[in-house]
Amino acid sequence: RQMCIRDSIQGAHIPYEGAIGTSIAKVFDMTVASTGLPGKRLRQAEINYMSSTIHPSSHAGYYPDAMPMSIKITFDPKTGKLYGGQIVGYDGVDKRIDEIALVIKHEGTIYDLMKVEQAYAPPFSSAKDPVAVAGYVAENIITGKVQPVYWRQLRDIEMENNFLLDVRTPDEFSLNTLPGAVNIPLDELRDRLDELPKDKMIYTFCAVGLRGYLAYRILVQHGFEKVRN
């Protein structure tokens, strides 16, 4: 806004391209950031969209002080055009939201996220940066490598016709899980496929997302047609 006023006063004819609403705030020890259009705004505008959510670390896990973050992006389910992104975390949130904002500003897609080049060293990032991973997950959704289910859909399902498969370890399962879930650890899944119903929709899940996705792929490759992750 200030730049537009300055240019007008000076007589410069520089077109204003508009803003995409990028913001960031410190909330106690956490950082919250947003850019572009979130799902709520897209639904209000009746724009068809899909979303992907990941929970990576701020940098390589083997390097000390890696902190968790959650990244959600919204995108067009056909073209992959990137609509928006939100991030909640502790460290590295600012640079990730800036990367997503830059792609949106240039009318980019989730495929551009996959190709963004970042500086890498273990104290600062991972070999596959979280922004790129968000793009990979979105690409998996668009190409049908995985069919996601969102919490809004899952909260209303009837257990009689559905099967919740928790693929975490028994120790993780003992701490907490979803009501009615059955625990088959990912490492045991291939040997215990006969315990799963083929006449029910199976929802795979884990703590973060990777193991749930791998379980989904295992089931699909073994002939299970009713699977969501």
Predicted feature residues:
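Short, small-residue-biased leader/transition segments that mark boundaries at the very start
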Residues: 1-5
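A short, well-structured juxtamembrane/interface segment
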Residues: 145-158
